[in-house]
C-alpha cells in the first residue's frame, strides 16, 4: 500500500493536461503480437527524455512479465523515486510494418500504454523528427518513415487483455482519449531524464558487464586471473619434518573425500605430493555445512603452524571500518571466490602444505585455509589493491564493502572497484554479490539506515546451544558468541562471570542443575538484539558509566537533532570485571576507573571530539579539577588525571535516582540471576 500511495503521490505531482496536437508530442502507431491473443494496437509515445522503454501491465500479458534481477529505481526532478520491479525481455514492436526488437521493457503505470525511450532511439539511430512524421533507421541501413498521430488514445485498462484473448467473448473496454485526460507524464524539466535515473539501463548494464568479467566459480579461472597474488611460507627450523599421523575414516567420509579431492585436482589447487611433511585432513559438518548440503574438508595444520614463521600483518580493526561508513546511505558488497586459493604459493612453500586423506598424499598450489599466515597474506594483497579507494571502500580479508552518500556516486564507486578487480584479476562470487542496498550484511552485522545489530544467525547460535553443557570447550564456544555480541548486551561481564568461573584451570569440570537453570535464564533474556545507532561525525556524544564492587559498565550515546528536538540514541555498551587489586579500591576510584575503561572502549569515537561524561558519582567532577602535588600515595590518581587530559569533555552529575542507566543495568542483571 505504501508503494501504491507513493506512486500516486508522484503521479499527482507530475501530471498535466497534454495537448496532443503540440508538434513536440510524438505519438506513433505500434503493434504487439502474443501467442493466444489478437493483435494489440497501441498509440506509443516517443519520449527521448526517458532513458527506458516503459509499458503498462495492461497491454502485455502477465506471463510475459518477470521479476527484475534487482529493483530499478528512477528519480525525478523533485527528488521522488519510482521503483520498477517487473520487466519484459526480448519483445518485438511492429511499426509501419517493420519489426523493431526491444531487449527490455520496464513495467510502470505512467498513464500511457507504451513509452518509447531514448535507448530505443539510440538503438535505431539516427532518429529524425519532422512536423508530420519521424524516421527510425532499421539495421543502420534503411530509413523507416512513420506518421505522427494527431489524436492518441489509451487502450490499456482493467479487462483489456482478457478481451484480446482469442475466442474471448469479453467486450473490449472503451479507449480513453489522452488529449482530454490527465496523464502522469513528466514534462520538460520533470521527465525521466538519463541524468536523474538512479540506475539507468545503460549504467546498470555497464555494472553487470564489469561484474561478469570478474566473477567465476573457479578461483583460478585462466580467463580471468592475473595470478598477481603470491606467497611464501618458511619453517623456523628447515631441517625438521612435520608429521602428524593419518586419521581413520568411515566409508561415507571416504566417498565424500573422493568427490572433493577430484574437484580440487580439477581446479588445480592441489597436486599429488612427495613431501616429507604431512597433516591429516578431515570433514566437518556444522550448521553452515548442513545449510549448503556439503561437508567441508579441513586440514589439521596445528603442528605446521607451530613450526612456521608467522606473519604479523593484521586485518583492520572492525570498529575502525565501521566508523568509515557512518552516515553512508547506499552499499554494495562483494565476496572473493575462495579468496585464499587466489594466492599462489611459491614452489618451495608447497611441500609444507602436504596433507593425507583416504586418496593419498597431496599438497597445495595455493594458500590453503587453516594456515595461520593465510589471513595476513590475503589482507596485505587486498590492501595493496584497494587502499587508494579508502574513502568509499573497505576490505576485511575477503569481504569488500563499497559505500556512498548517494546513488550517483555509488554507480561510479562500484564501477571503479570492479575495474580494479578486473585489472588485478581478483575473482568474485556472483552469488554473494549484493548491489545497491540500503540494508546490508557486513562483518557479521546487519547495517540498516544508520543502525546496526548482529545478524540473525548469532541469535540462532545462542538459542541452539544446549542448556546442559558437556565440557569446558563447549562452554568456551558459548561465551565466545556472547563476547562477539558484547556491544549489544548491557553488563555482559556480570552475566558471564558465573559461567566463566567454571573455566579456571584448577576447577574440575562439573555441570549442575543450577548451571542449567542459569543457562536457560541467560538465553531467555537474549531473545533479540536492539538495533544500535551509528553516530554521525557531527552528533554530540555522551558516555554514561556505572560501577559496583566487582564490575563496571558503560554506554555510548549520541544526541540526534531532528526538527529542533534532541533525542539521545544508544550506540554501544561496554562492561568488565575489576581485577583483584582493583576490587580493593575506594568506591570513588572504582567510579573513576569505570569512566576510564569506558573511554578506552569507545576511544575511536571519542578522539578528537568534545564529549560529555555523565555519572552519578559526585567525586568524579571534582577529581578532574583537583591539583595533586605528587604525593606518592596518590600516584594512581595523578596517572589517571594525566591520561584523561588527552581527551576533551564536560562532566555532568546526575542524581542516583535519575541514573536510569545504572537502574537498567541492575534490572537486566537481576532478571538473569533471579
Swiss-Prot record:
One of its GO terms (biological process) is proteolysis. GO terms for molecular function: aspartic-type endopeptidase activity; endonuclease activity; RNA-directed DNA polymerase activity. SUPFAM superfamilies: DNA/RNA polymerases. It holds the Pfam family RT_RNaseH. Its EC number is 3.4.23.-, 2.7.7.49. Residues 40-130 are annotated as: Protease. CDD domains: retropepsin_like, RNase_HI_RT_Ty3, RT_LTR. Keywords: Aspartyl protease, Endonuclease, Hydrolase, Nuclease, Nucleotidyltransferase, Protease, RNA-directed DNA polymerase, Transferase. Disulfide bonds: none annotated. It catalyses: DNA(n) + a 2'-deoxyribonucleoside 5'-triphosphate = DNA(n+1) + diphosphate. Residues 267-447 form the Reverse transcriptase domain. The active site is at 47. It comes from the Viruses. Belongs to the caulimoviridae enzymatic polyprotein family. Encodes for at least two polypeptides: protease (PR) and reverse transcriptase (RT). The protease processes the polyprotein in cis. Reverse transcriptase is multifunctional enzyme that converts the viral RNA genome into dsDNA in viral cytoplasmic capsids. This enzyme displays a DNA polymerase activity that can copy either DNA or RNA templates, and a ribonuclease H (RNase H) activity that cleaves the RNA strand of RNA-DNA heteroduplexes in a partially processive 3'- to 5'-endonucleasic mode. The polymerase/reverse transcriptase (RT) and ribonuclease H (RH) domains are structured in five subdomains: finger, palm, thumb, connection and RNase H. Within the palm subdomain, the 'primer grip' region is thought to be involved in the positioning of the primer terminus for accommodating the incoming nucleotide. The RH domain stabilizes the association of RT with primer-template. This is Enzymatic polyprotein. The lineage of its organism: Viruses, Riboviria, Pararnavirae, Artverviricota, Revtraviricetes.
